Every structure is written in C-alpha cells, then in structure tokens.
C-alpha cells in the first residue's frame, strides 16, 4: 500500500519530545532513564498508525512500550494516538528494524510484537520479511532468555513461512492460533488492519515464540 507523503510529519513529531525519541541511539542501554523506571520494555516493530501500541500502553501501565515505525508519514498518526491516550509509558521511534541493535542493548527488550507486517510475497524479497532469520538474529540479541515474540497476521502464506522460520531457528512455539478471534485467547488488542480484515470475515493468525537457549 502506497503511503501518502506528509512533508510536515518530521516537524510535527519533533514538537513532542516527551513522546517521540528523535535519536534513540543516544539511549542504548539507558532506556530506563527515558521512562524514569525499571519496568520491562516491550516494542512493536512496524507500529503503523499506533492503535495497538497505544492500547497496550493504556491497558498495562506497569510495562513500558516503544512503537517503532520507519515511515515518519505513518508514525505521525501514531503520535496522534499517543497524545490521545496520554500515558507516561509510551514512546515512539522512527527507525528501520535493521538498525535496532544501534538503539537497544543486548537483552534490553522484554518482548517484541510483529503485527500485520508486510508479507513481501515475491521470493526475491524473502529477506525483507520481519520473520526472516536475518531479523530473528537481531531479535535474539535484543531479548533476554525469557523474552518472547508475539506475531499476528491475516496472511496465511506469511504465517506458514514464519512458523517454519521460527521452528528452523530452534524457537519454542508457546501459542499458535489459526483463528484468533474465535479462540479462547483473552486480552487481544486489535490493530487498524486487524479490524478491517476481521470485519471482512478473514481469520487472524497469531503465534507466540521464544528462543530456546537451554
């Protein structure tokens, strides 16, 4: 989907330094100082317009959340959501997922959310998928031993690819649903895409996984 360029987005984001972290590399290993506490940090990679990450931050004040979205013209919508919920445990960052190790120390992130990531269906684009082993290597470094990845998508092909990728990486699959909204899973917070696709009757696929470091 083509994103409409908003030339004013960068300036708008920088008007709210309490929410938008312009230079996240400056806080590598020091994110507890940003939040003013030692609560666990959860990140969403590809936050889109921010409905999920804002909802999570509001529902779980004992956890710190960082929404990461590389496109500033999209992240500015997440900023509006963050302003609306007005909670102290939410920050936003504009960075490519490939650069996360520049922003976070090893083991600094307790949990990672991947919601409705671009499926990159063409074979030559496989390495761009956020569940590709290249990215799993990055996530493994960011997460502590007990850290988890939570992944949701409406794309069955991407979900099947991800199941294989996680398994071949020797990850432990602790939860798998092929129809999340008709399962007994509680506490689900929907993304904008999730609402749209589920309203059309499409099943939502979800998994939870962690790295096997025994």
Swiss-Prot record:
One of its GO terms (molecular function) is tRNA (guanine(46)-N7)-methyltransferase activity. Pfam families: Methyltransf_4 (PF02390). It comes from the Bacteria. The active site is at residue 118. PROSITE patterns: SAM_MT_TRMB. It comes from Listeria monocytogenes serovar 1/2a (strain ATCC BAA-679 / EGD-e). Substrate binds at residues 122, 154, 191-194. Disulfide bonds: none annotated. Keywords: Methyltransferase, S-adenosyl-L-methionine, Transferase, tRNA processing. Catalyzes the formation of N(7)-methylguanine at position 46 (m7G46) in tRNA. It is an enzyme of class 2 (transferase). It catalyses: guanosine(46) in tRNA + S-adenosyl-L-methionine = N(7)-methylguanosine(46) in tRNA + S-adenosyl-L-homocysteine. Belongs to the class I-like SAM-binding methyltransferase superfamily. TrmB family. The lineage of its organism: Bacteria, Bacillati, Bacillota, Bacilli, Bacillales. The keyword S-adenosyl-L-methionine applies. This is tRNA (guanine-N(7)-)-methyltransferase.
């Amino acid at each position: 989907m083509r994103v409409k360029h908003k030339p004013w987005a960068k300036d708008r984001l920088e008007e709210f330094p309490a929410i938008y972290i312009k230079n996240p590399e400056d806080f590598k290993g020091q994110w507890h100082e940003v939040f003013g506490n030692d609560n666990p940090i959860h990140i969403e990679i590809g936050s889109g317009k921010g409905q999920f990450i804002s909802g999570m931050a509001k529902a779980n004040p004992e956890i710190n959340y960082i929404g990461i979205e590389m496109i500033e013209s999209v992240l500015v919508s997440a900023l509006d959501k963050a302003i609306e919920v007005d909670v102290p445990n939410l920050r936003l960052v504009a960075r490519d997922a490939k650069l996360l190790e520049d922003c976070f120390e090893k083991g600094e992130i307790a949990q990672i959310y991947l919601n409705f990531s671009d499926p990159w269906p063409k074979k030559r684009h496989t390495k761009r998928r956020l569940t590709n082993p290249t990215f799993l290597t990055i996530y493994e470094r960011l997460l502590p031993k007990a850290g988890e990845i939570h992944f949701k998508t409406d794309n069955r092909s991407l979900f099947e690819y991800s199941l294989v990728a996680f398994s071949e990486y020797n990850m432990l699959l602790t939860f798998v649903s092929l129809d999340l909204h008709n399962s007994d899973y509680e506490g689900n917070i929907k993304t904008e895409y999730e609402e749209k696709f589920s309203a059309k009757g499409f099943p939502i696929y979800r998994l939870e996984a962690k790295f096997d470091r025994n």
